Amino acid sequence: MGGFEEAGSWVIVTMMWVGAFGGIMSKMKAFAPLSTLVMKLAKNVRQLMFMNGILCLAGNAALADEMAQIVTVGPITKELVENNVEGSEEDLYQLRLRNATFSSALGVFGSQLIPWHVYIGFYLGILSAVYPLHQFVAMDIIKYNVMAFIVVGSLLLLTLTGLDRFVPTFALPKEPKVKLKKKENLSENRSKKLA
């Protein structure tokens, strides 16, 4: 086999490995120190959500694959919100939607800004096959990907600054409606889970 014929032969096996990796790391609580660090840094819900976005982007860069980021970092951001934020079910749903948006959008569009990401490698391979007269590098693709810069930048900045309220149906619930659980409540919840 050669060329386009063998292009996807390894994808299913890789996705199974990535899914297993995310599940195993979650069961081992391997990322608990990372969650603890995020909670120490976050002073309010908006900062927590911004840090969830940064986690998604950092996970995408570290793992160099958007699906690996979704199955590995996705459960971390989900647990951060579920275990540390209190509010009405409707408001918590808004936070869950933002986490899903971070996982998806920062996975796909964030990958377009990471030079060592598998997407960029894939595109470079196609470009080199189609036009072999030029030696393409990752920055040839990244510097013209204005949409990725806008999506990643606006998602993070609108979340952090609160300017997301100007985008219809995109605003996060404000602080009195949702708030971080007090540290005493968190230690009680953890001791109940352990018992």
Where are these regions (language model features)?
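Cytoplasmic juxtamembrane regions at transmembrane-helix boundaries
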Residues: 27-48, 133, 177-188, 192
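Membrane-interfacial segments
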Residues: 25-33, 38, 42, 67, ...
